[in-house]
Curated annotation (Swiss-Prot):
Transmembrane segments: none annotated. Substrate binds at R18, H131, T352. Its cofactor is pyridoxal 5'-phosphate. PROSITE patterns: AA_TRANSFER_CLASS_2. This is Putative 8-amino-7-oxononanoate synthase. It comes from Neisseria gonorrhoeae (strain NCCP11945). The gene is bioF. SUPFAM superfamilies: PLP-dependent transferases (SSF53383). Belongs to the class-II pyridoxal-phosphate-dependent aminotransferase family. BioF subfamily. The modification N6-(pyridoxal phosphate)lysine is found at K239. Keywords: Biotin biosynthesis, Pyridoxal phosphate, Transferase. Homodimer. Pyridoxal 5'-phosphate binds at G106, Y107, S179, D205, E206, A207, H208, T236, F237, G238, K239.
Amino acid sequence: MKVFRQQLEQLGAQNQYRSIPDLIHQGRYITRENRKMLNMSSNDYLGLASDENLRRSFLQQYGGNFPSFTSSSSRLLTGNFPIYTDLEELVAQRFQRESALLFNSGYHANLGILPALTTTKSLILADKFVHASMIDGIRLSRCAFFRYRHNDYEHLKNLLEKNVGKFDRTFIVTESVFSMDGDVADLKQLVQLKKQFPNTYLYVDEAHAIGVYGQNGLGIAERDNLIAEIDLLVGTFGKALASVGAYAVCNQVLKECLINQMRPLIFSTALPPFNVAWTYFIFERLPQFSKERSHLEQLSAFLRREVAHRTQIMPSETCIVPYILGGNEATLAKAEYLQGQGYYCLPIRPPTVPKNTSRIRLSLTADMTTDEVRQFAACL
């Protein structure tokens, strides 16, 4: 065990040691070590996770005869239930696409999609800042890959030009809203680039955009009127939609390839039908949350201005607002100070973010009030 203890000691010396906190959730507040704090670190962007009215309406429709609490199997064996197909059809219909496929989590989706759809003769070109789950999926693909500079589409174009005709297919991989900086990919440019090169496919992760952007809450692709142009549009139900699981929107051919070749789908026990039914309930109502989306944007614009005034660094265009401090020690100290002031703010350090860009990732939710965010900004 000595070697493992040494690894932990090294993490501690670098201010990178992590532990799982004991938390009590009370709506938009969190209690930790007897301190009640406004939760500034949640991905519950629309504030639906603690909405008692939604929860009550969902439960009442069953009259005590609830869907099963377990699927007990993979969907390809005996773990498929009608509610899965119902949700896939609803998602596909809302996106006006041919097909949709459900997954247990966003991590499962990103881990399995690329290995299922590539060969050793394929190429993957990924934004430098894509999520760790995408990086893990790329590594498992065992094909050639390059990471283009973050949102640098000239660099991406150069990589595409250099590799024309060398591979059987090319996947461009990006997030729409980036989870640590809160900035947004230019999906229009990516679609244009994809169309310029043969056998090139665009894979966009909308985990932090679904629910929050677009007239119907379908994400940046909806906002930019590009849903039909993106080959694989992936999102999660576990953030703004207050549930669990993930989806991919695509054509029927790609869906069938994933069903036949995607290991995390084939070899995982499916989500409980009860959870899938809750997801259906929320997703069906997604267009109704326009007031929450508007309020969240107002809060976000205010906080972005306040943080930019203090740090002069503001890549964000969204409700994810990075307060970049640089060093681990300063970031840990600031997070502890803000927690002492009644705000649950968490430090984000390497390897989650690049070296010397440690930050507090501020994440706003629609159930916060304007006064609460103003009072928080005054503490910065």
